[in-house]
Amino acid sequence: MLEPQENGLTDLPDYEHIEDETFPPFPPPASPGREDGEGAEPEEESGRGAPVPVPPKRTVKRNIPKLNAERLISERGLPALRHVFEKAKFKGKGHEAEDLKTLIRHMEHWAHRLFPKLQFEDFIDRVECLGNKKEVQTCLKRIRLDLPILHEDFVSNNDEVEENNGHDVTATELDHFLTNSYGSVEFASESSRSLTEEEQQRIERNKQLALERRQAKLLSNSQSLGNDLSVNTPSTQTSEAGSTGEEQKEEESNGFNKDLLDSPHNAGAASTVNEEEQLKVEETQLDQSF
């Protein structure tokens, strides 16, 4: 302690003859010997010199819309052209220029809705190139044939079919017997027509066959008669002439009977005609024998 002197003043020590205190040197920066957090600042300062690798930013790539075949046959593509000109009014003859302007205006509106990035001229060129694709051609065929393309078309067609089926069911329930009777009448008329045509063909065919057989037999009989005339007596000639006449009658009757027997509707008439012909033949034979 410093002793107080007179007049309230203290005697200051003599610092000139006192040796300086020796302090240990400072440890290097960021060394484990330093307990305080002062080493963090030099680290940051030293790290500024070296380049630190920065992770790349993730960029989200957006799908750029393209005018391809799938987009052209979509809901706003070619199927929408069926309804583009529903409200369009054309003036007709004498106003061709105005009608063409309205047509192009509606087409431009359709093209802008489908793909607004392209101009109308470029859009037309692109659509012309896409017209060779198979998908586009099938879509155009379905439009021309009025076939369903979109899901809405399928749903509307199914609804119409169900409604029609409901009406058909009620109609068939009410008019079941009428339709059956009408169908049976039509079937009977068609079958009768076909039968009559077949019968006519059979009759003509049988007639031709009978005539051919008759001519062949007549020729053979005439030749045999010519040979027998030089040998046989006149009585035999008369008997042969009668036999040839009978054979001709029998051939004619047989041909006629065949024609009648071939037709199913004339079976009864054919049997009666056969009986009459047989009776006539028997009568002629009895007359010749007497």
Curated annotation (Swiss-Prot):
Keyword DNA damage belongs to the record: yes
Keyword Lipoprotein: no
Localization in the cell: Cytoplasm; Nucleus
GO molecular function: DNA binding
Pfam families xrefs: Swi3 (PF07962)
Endpoints of the signal sequence: none
UniProt biased composition (Polar residues): 221-242
Positions where Phosphothreonine occurs in the chain: T233, T244
Example of a GO biological process term: replication fork processing
Positions carrying Phosphoserine: S194, S222
Listed GO CC annotations: chromatin; cytoplasm; nucleus; replication fork protection complex
Record key words, sorted: Cell cycle, Cell division, Cytoplasm, DNA damage, Mitosis, Nucleus, Phosphoprotein
Recorded superkingdom: Eukaryota
Region described as Disordered: 1-59, 221-290
Region of interest (Interaction with TIMELESS), residue spans: 67-143
Assembly and oligomerization: Interacts with TIMELESS (via N-terminus), which impairs TIMELESS self-association. Associates with the MCM2-7 complex. Interacts with RPA2, PRDX2.
Role summary: Plays an important role in the control of DNA replication and the maintenance of replication fork stability. Important for cell survival after DNA damage or replication stress. May be specifically required for the ATR-CHEK1 pathway in the replication checkpoint induced by hydroxyurea or ultraviolet light. Forms a complex with TIMELESS and this complex regulates DNA replication processes under both normal and stress conditions, stabilizes replication forks and influences both CHEK1 phosphorylation and the intra-S phase checkpoint in response to genotoxic stress.
Membership in a protein family: Belongs to the CSM3 family.
Protein name stated in the entry: TIMELESS-interacting protein
GN (gene name): TIPIN
